[in-house]
Amino acid sequence: MMKTGDEADLSVDAALRAKTCKNHSATHLLQKALREVLGTHVEQAGSYQDGERTRFDFSHFAAMTPEELEKVEKIVNDKIAEAIPVRTDVMTVDEAKKTGAMALFGEKYGETVRVVSMGDFSKEFCGGTHVKNTSEIAAFKIISENGVAAGVRRIEALTGDNVFAYYRNLEKELLEAAKAAKATPATLTEKIEHMQAEIKALTSENESLKSKAAKEALGDVMDQID
């Protein structure tokens, strides 16, 4: 139990901070990518980052299509590959607005604000921790998109080593599924389609036999009545 006057050492978890930085900076790229793909009606409705993932809530009226998600993901990864320097500047609110920096809707700001810029692609009011260059994010992968309230969607995504771990896990599951189906990853889809066709044929044959048996049973009953 600590008491007044006790000394303590304070240190930053560098590894956790680095992962959180990647997720936070990726979220800035994500918001701009969403506005490019879906429209400028997209605004932040909530945001959370830790060392594992980023979670971003935004205004939108419908579930995103697979094609839209793919476009957004590609834009973010393209900006990561461009190795854009991440710059921070402190300026007055009026100066920040003149730069075109995005502010959080409904948020009240003081006389000065911090603006985080990623080239000409993304500029936002932000006081959080970030990478120094988008290349540090390494990779970006959307893992889910769903609704959380009327007119509000949520995206969860991974960055860096967590993306590679995600794909390694998918590969492991694919190999296990292929083994169970006595196929290879390359032939798994074909094998599943073949199995589905067999099941459909057997189901149809079973229904036909049941119908035939029912008719025969009915015939026996009618014979007994006669």
Locate the predicted segments by residue.
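Short, conserved phosphate-binding/catalytic loop or strand-edge motifs used
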Residues: 48-55
